[in-house]
């Protein structure tokens, strides 16, 4: 369900300690970035479990990003930052390199005319390549949408990414033990299988 637009969201975010306002913003190798974080359910739990690591939730819609701010306050997090930069402009707004980027339950944009909006379209993958440090850095994706997952697999391969791990059933894989389940996953895990992959940029990226 889409959130009703909150016209005060951006001004509230601008007053928040952990909202990134000044760019370019310097990221570090051990920072964890999540692109299209939505309400921040997964990244907030990751930040809670790893208090000595910095996390950056990138969500372009202020109304949605405000939900992340609320989670930060509720959990008393000191290591989760919010950015409302559009994912198509990451290379213009961030300097430095990271070893980890996540996409979690991204909008699949199923209609063909919306292909360029999918977060695994070539132009977005190029942005992630720019931010990832090297071929040992990891790009993680999990989704319950099979069509989006298959599209992402094809797009990654066509754009010179290496697939390190691929499964159509995350909860019955070797990565289930470390997987942080969102409320959606917990609610539907008996009925819906979660697709998951780990990729890295190719040698010539």
UniProtKB/Swiss-Prot annotation:
Active-site residues, as the UniProt record annotates them: 107
Protein name: tRNA (guanine-N(7)-)-methyltransferase
PROSITE patterns the record matches: SAM_MT_TRMB (PS51625)
Lineage: Bacteria, Bacillati, Mycoplasmatota, Mycoplasmoidales, Metamycoplasmataceae
Domain of life: Bacteria
Enzyme class, UniProt record, top EC level: transferase
Family under the similarity heading: Belongs to the class I-like SAM-binding methyltransferase superfamily. TrmB family.
Catalysed reactions listed for this entry: guanosine(46) in tRNA + S-adenosyl-L-methionine = N(7)-methylguanosine(46) in tRNA + S-adenosyl-L-homocysteine
Keyword check for Transferase: yes
Pathway: tRNA modification; N(7)-methylguanine-tRNA biosynthesis
InterPro entries: SAM-dependent_MTases_sf, tRNA_(Gua-N-7)_MeTrfase_Trmb, tRNA_methyltr_TrmB_bact
Enzyme Commission code: 2.1.1.33
Residues where substrate binds: 111, 144, 182-185
Residues where S-adenosyl-L-methionine binds: 34, 59, 86, 107
